[in-house]
């Protein structure tokens, strides 16, 4: 009888860019020794669209529809960062009512993003049932978005100095009803997932990142807070009206995939607390700063020339960005989302540098998966939470 021969040389396989667990067009070139991962090389750029260069040839208002295509599952945050920069450059004050509505929309968007992280993450490690549950809750959030902004995704709702439109009649009551309903849903998720022994076997102790290591890699968001660092830009930078609400920064110290799951689950509960307080205290008044109309440069224009404006929905004014540099950031669901903006006394920005959290957080993937099993790649990649539209830009 001929004895079976075994291969001892390494195997190189490709995961993606069309693999359903890649969360977009991400390609991983993986070197395996049996089931053990020896090396992992991420290949990026399949979804590069030149977003930074496009910004240099658009006014801020013209560019707003583009920014919703970065992280297309949390578009309120990309809109917020795009109007916060010009507001700070022009020293434009946002009315209190507009700031409250912005905060509500941002936190709803955070919950929707975390939900759409949770479902595919569970599906990646073999649990199909939660995937269908999260879409039920997510649809309720999108119904609220549709009622307030007219769009379920790609909302184009934020404006320089405020928002595009006020909340419709009855929207606040609907949102409060959703908050009460969703808090019960989070308890259901925790019963279904958090104490599940199979789930714990797949995530506990997998992909551990220490606190110092997380800081050295420049990680942010749940990736950083799950490693024991209590850092949240909503507390640190005091933007919008987060200081007026009672809420806590959610963090864990273990630094593994389970800790990152627990941080995101807890953040959804904290977001509901913020939304409930904002809805109960929301003030009256205007939803946009009418004073910014003085920046507008109205000219006598001829039909269809470059400066012509069609008479339709009244846009925010186009004004010159002063000649200075500015870095603005917000706490997005995936981490610190920032832009480095350089004005040049023109209606177009001279430079618009995007700091995407997913791109920075993804850099540590190669180190995390080494010496792990092949099946652990999906767990670790899923716990990072990336969107390739934001990573490649």
From Swiss-Prot:
EC number(s) recorded for this UniProt protein: 7.1.1.-
Catalysed reaction, written as an equation: a plastoquinone + NADH + (n+1) H(+)(in) = a plastoquinol + NAD(+) + n H(+)(out); a plastoquinone + NADPH + (n+1) H(+)(in) = a plastoquinol + NADP(+) + n H(+)(out)
GO molecular function annotation: NAD binding; oxidoreductase activity, acting on NAD(P)H, quinone or similar compound as acceptor; quinone binding
Gene Ontology cellular component terms for the protein in this record: chloroplast thylakoid membrane
Topology term for the membrane: Peripheral membrane protein
GO BP of this protein: photosynthesis, light reaction
Top-tier EC class: translocase
Matching PROSITE patterns: COMPLEX1_49K (PS00535)
Source species, domain of life: Eukaryota
Cysteine pairings via disulfide bonds: none
Keyword set, alphabetical order: Chloroplast, Membrane, NAD, NADP, Plastid, Plastoquinone, Quinone, Thylakoid, Translocase, Transport
One Pfam family cited in the UniProt record for this chain: Complex1_49kDa
Chloroplast is among the record's keywords: yes
Cell compartment(s), UniProt: Plastid, Chloroplast thylakoid membrane
Family: Belongs to the complex I 49 kDa subunit family.
Binding partners and assembly: NDH is composed of at least 16 different subunits, 5 of which are encoded in the nucleus.
Matching HAMAP family: NDH1_NuoD
Protein name per the record: NAD(P)H-quinone oxidoreductase subunit H, chloroplastic
Organism: Jasminum nudiflorum (Winter jasmine)
